[in-house]
Amino acid sequence: MSKVLLGDVAVEHKETCKGSKDGYPIVGLEHLIPEEITLTAWNEGSENTFSKMFRKGNVLFGRRRAYLKKAAVAPFDGICSGDITVIEAKPDRILPELLPFMIQNDDLFEFAVGKSAGSLSPRVKWEHLKNYEFELPDMGKQKELAELLWAMDNTKKSYQKLIAATDELVKSQFFGSLKRKGSHLIHVV
């Protein structure tokens, strides 16, 4: 393992949409879910002032109010808010599949909060984020680690789906039993 700076293994992706935004998914800070590594929400309309482009595999880092711990990997190309820093892996230095996990961690967010400026809506700049230092294994270990972390994330998501389905089943059974006992109870609920 060797110590590296984030700026040694990743760059800020700076690309702007110069033409029509039609067909591009739009991602705002509200679409980044705290402590979730995958992006699951976005808008489809082009009615906004955003012009910052991101590419599939880039990490979208919520630079405003970093204490909210918002960072997710992009599953597609799109356009995002200026309050999102788009981070791209240097594939010869870090496995792109591992980068989201190196960014979505408490130590980096603590570092980001410490470097943020502003009182009502503190923001951190890439110029500061790139100086975040962390341990990085060789490429072989990075591959093993990325596979393990993605498997864990997929397992977590499967459990979340199971819990949601169980919750819906319990609700339907509960309301079904109320209907059988007397329809007047439904109106009270």
Which residues does each PLM region occupy?
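Non-catalytic DNA-recognition/assembly elements of restriction-modification systems
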Residues: 1-17, 131-146, 154, 162-189
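A short beta-sheet element
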Residues: 50-52, 59-104
